[in-house]
């Protein structure tokens, strides 16, 4: 997998990625057949893993030019172009126009602080939040699972609207 040089992109480690997908599998195999969003996609590791595990389609949103170039190469080299949409745009500007998703991966830079507005704008059944700290889960979301892996905290949240 191509990863752009520098510190702007922090790919999810293999260990954390495996743990995330095991957790999603335990939640009624949430990825299989789902429409997936990889927001702040970077190299696309999470969305590409979702495609390899049977996601119907993945929309990748990445604003960084170098990361978007690497992501496009990764999509092509793995043969997922037919089930992938890549948009080079700021995630916060794109999200209000987004369709609903089954699963959304949210892995912004660790300094990101706009979680409440990001989750408020997101329309998804499940969201996987990756950060260096626990985030406060907004009222319309319920915490399903939280785990720490070294410096990384992964929270899986479910839209309370999906339970109605």
Predicted segments with their positions:
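Class I S-adenosyl-L-methionine-dependent methyltransferase catalytic core
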Residues: 1-164
